[in-house]
Amino acid sequence: MAANLPNMRSIRRVMGVDPGLTRCGIGVVDGYPGLARLVGVDVLHTPADAELGDRLAALEDGLVQWLDRAAPDVVAVERVFSQHNVRTVMGTAQAGAVALLVAARRGVPVVWHTPSEVKAAVTGQGRAGKDQVAFMVRRLLRAPGLAAPADATDALALAICQLWRGAAMARLAAGGAR
Amino acid sequence: MAANLPNMRSIRRVMGVDPGLTRCGIGVVDGYPGLARLVGVDVLHTPADAELGDRLAALEDGLVQWLDRAAPDVVAVERVFSQHNVRTVMGTAQAGAVALLVAARRGVPVVWHTPSEVKAAVTGQGRAGKDQVAFMVRRLLRAPGLAAPADATDALALAICQLWRGAAMARLAAGGAR
């Protein structure tokens, strides 16, 4: 049925952000449910021995460059519900706040996905391991040789998750059949 | 002894920030150990039903206005070590990140104090209650009629704590007697 063919207008660009102070993963993909193309990938680093404010400012600079360069339709950020280490939660929250802030300043909508939503979207299993997520990201993007650390493949998985789920949620919101 | 007289050059202006998304307390004081003068106090509100990114952007606007207007020598922020509610920790961390970011962008140093350090500085007791902190803030600032909510008096207490402790830490760092 024609209604099931992907429409060119439905192609979206998503920038996934795996927030972190020491390593912040960035992954940009284009596509629609079932097809994702790699646009760009990066890991922003800030030195652990620098002042926290300077680290956040450096992170802001990097995120602004990526937002302006990639011009995504939407930014997808990992939603952290609970972690054992309060220090890690704080760093993740602080880095995530900067991503949110720069996206809001540019009028780019931000969506959130939990780690299990992301894992389920790319592997079919909400408790998949890091290696399996990285393997499936490379397969889905048809980039088997992609050299990228886990923070980067996690950000790409977030972006792919939004391509898949975002469209499904939009259909549900519009009252369409699934 | 002359060495114990406060030196005009030691007068510092501190802006205390009690970070929060729904209510962010701001308190600015001038002084030196033993004397604190109220400069300004405010609570920044952001609507709980707004997008998180827009809330952070509104908070940034308010903090920038206060930083530019008050021109503090240093910003003191509450250091959160642990809270039971992860959602509250995240909001505090996100709001604190914005305060850090805007201070770093303007080259204003940021210092951290734990709630118990703040309580001990203004009441002599690290486990003092909110009412006791608010009472002592009004007494120390000689502003018994100050109408300000707890978020604002907490921010003032943070600023006073930095006036007291900051000088002591600077003396210790310089190798002087306590």
UniProtKB/Swiss-Prot annotation, chains A, B:
**Name used for this protein in its record:** Crossover junction endodeoxyribonuclease RuvC
Active site at: 18, 78, 151
Family assignment from sequence similarity: Belongs to the RuvC family.
| Reactions it catalyzes | Endonucleolytic cleavage at a junction such as a reciprocal single-stranded crossover between two homologous DNA duplexes (Holliday junction)
Q: How does it assemble?
A: Homodimer which binds Holliday junction (HJ) DNA. The HJ becomes 2-fold symmetrical on binding to RuvC with unstacked arms; it has a different conformation from HJ DNA in complex with RuvA. In the full resolvosome a probable DNA-RuvA(4)-RuvB(12)-RuvC(2) complex forms which resolves the HJ.
Write down the superkingdom of origin: Bacteria
Gene source species = Acidothermus cellulolyticus (strain ATCC 43068 / DSM 8971 / 11B)
Sorted UniProt keywords: Cytoplasm, DNA damage, DNA recombination, DNA repair, DNA-binding, Endonuclease, Hydrolase, Magnesium, Metal-binding, Nuclease
